Design a protein with these regions (language model features):
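Conserved N-terminal alpha-helix of the aminotransferase class I/II PLP-enzyme fold
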Residues: 1-46, 74-78
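Conserved PLP-binding catalytic core of the aspartate aminotransferase-like
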Residues: 241-252
Length: 252
């Protein structure tokens, strides 16, 4: 039977298709991201998987930043081979390498900013321009930045990933992920999301909502602490500091 319309919006007739608690979290993140819609997944890597499988098909190619989060590399470089999906990597410090990697089979540009392993910052506007010029889909892992610092969909990306396990949660007691999308890719992601069953449970959604209440306070303190730690380590002769806000660094 048709589920009754919930007062806060939507039909809730089957838990895997959404609950009132996950709906509230989606609306909170939608406002933060300034996007068309936000999908919720059980883990951050679930959002990585969903973003790729929503738009990439056998015979397509992906261009990803090198290095990327190691599980993402394992997925793109190894696992996807069995689906006849090829991944090539570009140097995030030289976007000319990105342009040179594009072929007629290229479907998706996968970006991390900053990079998970070595914290490179990239010219995101230029990447978006390259993607649009070549009619490619674009996705960015924005876990480090979160929409508190960066709003990728507003900037021009098609999809934006955040591992809610990290800063959104803030208490090390919940796993989850979010995938913000624009209108262009909404139907692709919605279809894949329903079929794969990558849905966040209401209890986890509740804990993430709790964490979001202090997100700004925690990130401001993280920023202050990082500057102090970086300043200390920069004076250590046996430490190589990969910190983008250090004077003289490539990304300063």
């Amino acid at each position: 039977s048709k589920g009754k319309k919930n007062p806060i919006g939507g039909h809730f007739e089957y838990g895997r298709q959404g609950t009132s608690t996950t709906y509230i979290l989606q609306q909170m993140l939608k406002r933060m991201e300034e996007c068309y819609h936000v999908f919720l997944t059980p883990t951050g890597f679930g959002s990585v998987f969903l973003s790729i499988f929503s738009v990439v098909r056998p015979g397509d190619e992906i261009i990803a930043a090198d290095p990327v989060y190691s599980p993402t590399r394992l997925l793109t470089e190894n696992f996807l081979k069995s689906f006849n999906i090829k991944t090539v990597f570009y140097n995030p410090n030289d976007l000319n390498t990105l342009k040179k990697k594009i072929t007629k089979k290229t479907k998706l540009i996968y970006v991390e900013n900053p990079g998970s392993n070595s914290f490179e910052f990239q010219d995101l506007s230029k990447i978006i321009s390259i993607a649009k010029k070549n009619k490619l889909f674009s996705v960015i892992d924005n876990t480090w930045g979160t929409p508190y610092y960066l709003k990728p969909i507003k900037l021009g990306f098609d999809m934006s990933i955040v591992s809610a396990t990290k800063y959104y949660s803030g208490h090390s007691d919940v796993m989850g992920g979010s995938l913000a999308v624009n209108k262009r890719v909404f139907k692709y992601v919605e279809k894949a999301n329903k079929i794969t069953g990558l849905r966040l449970g209401p209890d986890d959604a509740y804990l993430i909502i709790r964490g979001l209440r202090t997100l700004d306070v925690r990130l401001d303190r993280h920023e202050e602490n990082a500057k102090k730690v970086a300043s200390f380590l920069s004076r250590h002769k046996k430490v190589k500091l990969l910190y983008p806000y250090k004077k003289g660094s490539y990304n300063y």
